[in-house]
Amino acid sequence: MVLMLLAICAVLILFICLPAEIWSGGGEAAAEEAAVEVPMTEEDEEQADLAATTLVKEGMMAPDFTVTLFDGSQVTLSSLRGRVVLLNFWATWCPPCREELTRVQAELIDRFADRPFTFLPVSRGEERETVAAFREKTGYTFAMGLDPEQAIYKLYAANYIPRNFLIDREGRVVLASIGYEPEEFDALVARIDALLGE
């Protein structure tokens, strides 16, 4: 009996002596003080930075624009509704952009020529003369959009190229990617094929 009374007294003393902040809901603050922030790795920081520069995310409607093509004609993105569109931002000085473009003719334009697909590459921040010299050197003949003031690019992103925005038939972005990796390009081609099959 004495032991039981001592145990009850000890429990009562414990409750009386607990800090008031725990009773008043301050337990979260106490828990936060006990938590340790895990520093981000350099790779985590780089990925967060890349993601933050993407203004149009997957699931969003693609912002509409009108772009002047290399041949002087114009195309408005919304006029392509009903087609799957791959919007690609690139520049002639960008090595991964140039590497990605080497795969476009055979793996996109020729492959999907008889299907409702449009490849819309937009040169970011370059004048027509620069793109003309690049086309002459490479022999590319597919349509290329010009965005010398980066007005179109700034609707979609704040930094980094190459960038791809895969847009479905309703005008919704279903994939947004940064950079060029051969395996990711393969996956992109497969995704286009799947969208065209829907």
Feature map (PLM): residue ranges:
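Conserved redox-active cysteine motifs that mediate thiol-disulfide chemistry
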Residues: 81-82, 89-106
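Conserved hydrophobic/aromatic "anchor" residues
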Residues: 65, 80, 89-93, 134, ...
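Hydrophobic beta-strand core positions in alpha/beta domains
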Residues: 86-88, 121, 166
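N-terminal targeting signals for export/organelle localization
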Residues: 1-61, 189, 198
